[in-house]
A protein has these predicted regions:
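Bacterial N-terminal signal peptides
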Residues: 9-19
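Bacterial Sec-dependent signal peptides at the C-terminal "C-region" and cleavage site
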Residues: 17-30
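Accessory carbohydrate-recognition regions in carbohydrate-active enzymes
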Residues: 27-439, 445-495, 508-529, 535-538, ...
């Protein structure tokens, strides 16, 4: 079945949202509240790596429970977001998390409420009471956009979380008559290892504001984070505790009641204990973050740190506005999948500048964002494909111009002078391959997004594409490919560089920079240098020109010829010129047969357990990782869109469910989710930079895109059901649409795209070459 069953809590929300549907003849009811159809628990199982906690759209703060932050880096994959649904205990509530990343860090400033004797260590999950971690039940959990709550069953404390852009607000209801305490553990960190905390500090200010910082050498070395924290109840006492036994403090004791009740403490293993005594009302803890300094955190707290209910109401309103960009009519489980996917797609790139515009850049210096908001958390190898095109389409232009301005500023401040590769907290991690900030900028420019210096952007793009020390680029510029005997993952790098080069050429041509355009148009064809005509695969070559042997198209190994994949996935990565690739494969028929072989491949005898990112397999199609994401749409390029329609159904049915285990792979900062949003609407950006969306098939009965500028673009379906999975015909604004793509400008202009569904394939629609989507070798440019 296409649509599964809803979880009970979400079903109740959905029923509540639609209970006021009008009777015949009554006035139309307002559109259902989209918050009722978002389930942040989706993807919190072992593969999705999403978090259930509270955050605002693109918020700096992601306030969420951590179920295990004690595991060491190589054992933590299921806990990349801090929370894993199948864990029985909560270790605490920390303020920073990635959504769906395949690697991790963060988990900053962990707070844990306690009663009675204060425990200073988390303890063993298998030994209740051995530390401050607490058991909990999912029946006591509530999660919705901007709000999370749970009861810690070991103590009876009710914990509630909400968040604004730069603040997180905790609300703890303690059992009556019990002494209330908070433990703040600056040692706790996701993907931890010995020595990760370089330095940290705690400072109790005269007005009762607790401030502090820590510097870590995790995924982003030298990352600094500052915080400010205020409490709604007066403190009876506090203690700053240094747990560093390896390097005990040898200096003189500062003033204070005892050795721990100090105004300030510095060290590598700090904790703070806040004591309140019995409380008659819930305790609110208001926390703001800054990447700049403690003064910045205090200013952010002053700017946004209202009471819990005010912040929750404000953030829920922001989520309603953001989610209202797409109105969905679909059966409840599908609607939940799509709205949750949209929610996940609106979490990053996250705000990194303070309320006053200051931010810490890639050079570890403080800068000021003038007339834009600096954003970070760029998982560009993943998100250039669909996440950024989705934001460009449904978010106000300011969001994308902020992103582009942040990329340009990062290049200007980078010690290497290039655009980000995988950046968070303003720091480069050098994770993954390509220079995929380039297609993000080009796609925005070509779609008419302004608000940034196009000349500076193009200069940054060219600088990134010609930086010889990076990823074999020196050899790529000299040989026309990356040689595998000099650089790992060379086949993947060659084809991805060629695509990025094509987007530079497109933008340069549109700007009238003919010399730059010609140079990168030549480079855009470099993928051909990796094509092995004898085998029909895109392969890695040696510096002397020979293809590397032995060769196994099914082999997946880190640091091999390909990046997180094999020849089956990467031999389709020529988004700028699929027609030329199909010609080399022997024509449309051969390409279709090879696509079918990919999906139908029997992988039962292959072992990919060593490759943690390889998940969501349908044959050799791997939906749980990004290189496959465009592949189902390639049948359209071969004149067989009906086969795309069948494959999309196969993927959507098997890879997305409204459950904690409902994502087949890492959400990767919104890319897995953006794929579903586009696909459910009936089209997908196979080639960002072409200004085209390839038409697939819809999974909604009706959808309305409320576009920036007040335009509305409607997707309508007739006859959509499990019995009618194929597109019979497509109409755009009432006229038959013979081509199998729709232009970005056509969507932005507003109108209606109508699908008539039927039981059997329409094998004629889209067969003609003139009807097919963009390919460089056949385009009239």
């Amino acid at each position: 079945m296409l649509y599964g069953a809803m979880t009970r809590p979400l079903l109740l929300l959905a029923l509540a949202a639609t209970a006021l549907a009008p009777r015949a003849g009554a006035e139309p009811a307002p559109a259902p509240d989209p918050l009722a159809f978002v389930d942040p628990m989706i993807g919190t199982g072992p593969e999705g790596h999403t978090f259930p906690g509270a955050t605002a759209p693109f918020g700096m703060v992601q306030l969420s429970p951590d179920t295990d932050a004690t595991c060491r880096i190589r054992d933590c994959y299921a806990h990349a977001a801090g929370y894993s649904y199948h864990d029985p205990t909560i270790q605490g509530f920390s303020h920073t998390h990635f959504s769906g990343a395949g690697h991790s860090d963060l988990g900053d400033i962990l707070v844990m409420p306690q009663v009675g004797d204060v425990k200073l260590d988390p303890g063993d999950p298998a030994a209740p009471g051995s530390g401050y971690r607490q058991p909990f039940s999912h029946e006591s959990e509530t999660a919705s956009p901007g709000y999370y709550a749970v009861t810690l069953s070991g103590s009876g404390i009710r914990a509630e979380l909400t968040a604004g852009t730069r603040v997180g607000i905790h609300r703890y209801s303690f059992p009556a008559g019990r002494d209330a305490h908070l433990l703040i553990d600056l040692r706790s960190s996701l993907y931890d290892y010995p020595g990760k905390i370089l330095w940290s500090g705690l400072h109790m200010r005269p007005d009762g504001t607790l401030t502090g910082f820590r510097e870590t050498r995790g995924w982003a070395p030298g990352r600094k984070l500052y915080f400010a924290m205020r409490f709604s109840a007066p403190l009876r006492g506090h203690a700053f505790i240094d747990r560093d036994e390896a390097i005990p403090y040898k200096g003189f004791q500062g003033p204070g009641r005892g050795s721990d009740a100090l105004a300030e403490k510095l060290g590598k293993a700090l904790e703070a204990r806040m004591d309140f005594g019995p409380l008659a009302a819930p305790l609110e803890v208001r926390v703001a973050l800054s990447g700049v300094d403690e003064a910045g955190a205090i200013a952010n707290l002053d700017a946004e740190g209202a009471d819990f209910d005010t912040v929750r109401t404000r953030t829920q309103a922001a989520w309603r506005e953001a989610l209202h960009a797409v109105e969905i009519e679909a059966p409840a489980p599908m609607r939940t999948n799509i709205y949750t996917a949209l929610y996940h797609a609106l979490l990053a790139p996250s705000v990194w500048s303070d309320a006053d515009g200051r931010y810490r850049g890639p050079d570890d210096q403080v800068h000021v964002a003038k007339d834009f908001t600096f954003r970070s958390t760029f998982s560009l190898w993943d998100t250039f494909r669909a996440e950024h095109p989705l934001l460009t389409l449904i978010q106000p232009a300011r969001t994308t111009s902020d992103i582009v301005n942040s990329l340009i500023a990062s290049r200007r401040e980078s010690p290497d002078g290039i655009l980000p590769v995988w950046q968070f907290a303003g720091r480069e991690t050098w994770t993954m391959i390509g220079y995929h900030a380039v297609p993000v900028i080009a796609d925005a420019y070509l779609k008419g997004i302004g608000g940034f210096d196009a000349d500076a952007a193009l200069e940054a793009m060219v600088a990134s594409a010609t930086y010889a020390p990076y990823g074999g680029l020196g050899d790529y510029m000299r040989l026309g490919y990356v040689p595998i005997d000099r650089e790992p993952e060379a086949a993947s790098k060659t084809v991805e560089y060629a695509y990025d080069d094509w987007t530079i050429a497109r933008m340069a041509r549109a700007m009238g920079k003919a010399d730059i355009a010609a140079r990168f148009e030549r480079r855009a064809g470099n993928w051909r240098n990796s094509f092995d005509a004898k085998s029909g695969w895109l392969r890695a070559r040696l510096a002397d020109g020979r293809f590397r042997t032995p060769f196994d198209p099914t082999a997946i190994n880190y640091g091999s010829d390909y990046t997180e994949g094999n020849a089956w996935q990467y031999s389709w990565f020529v988004p700028q010129d699929q027609a030329a690739l199909f010609a080399l494969l022997g024509g449309d028929g051969k390409a279709i047969a090879k696509l079918d072989a990919m999906f139908d491949y029997d992988v039962s005898k292959l072992d990919y357990s060593h490759a943690e990112d390889i998940a969501g397999l349908i044959g050799q199609y791997i939906h749980g990782n990004e290189p496959s994401h465009h592949v189902a749409y390639l049948y359209v390029h071969a004149g067989a869109p009906w086969r795309t329609q069948a494959r999309l159904r196969q993927i959507v049915e098997s890879q997305y469910r409204p459950t904690p285990d409902g994502l087949s792979g890492n959400d990767d900062l919104g890319q897995m989710s953006a794929w579903l949003v586009f696909t459910a609407l009936g089209f997908y950006p196979v080639t960002p930079g072409s200004n085209q969306y390839v038409i697939g098939r819809p999974f909604v009965e009706r959808a309305v895109l409320n576009l920036p500028g007040g335009k509305r673009f409607t997707v309508e379906t007739q006859g959509l059901s499990d019995a009618n999975p194929y597109v019979g015909r497509v109409e755009l604004n009432g006229a038959p649409l013979a081509r199998t793509w729709i232009g970005d400008a056509e969507i932005r202009a507003g109108g209606t795209l109508r699908f008539v569904m039927q039981a059997m394939p329409n094998r004629d629609w889209g067969r003609a070459r003139a009807a097919r989507p963009y390919s460089r070798s056949t385009a009239d440019e």
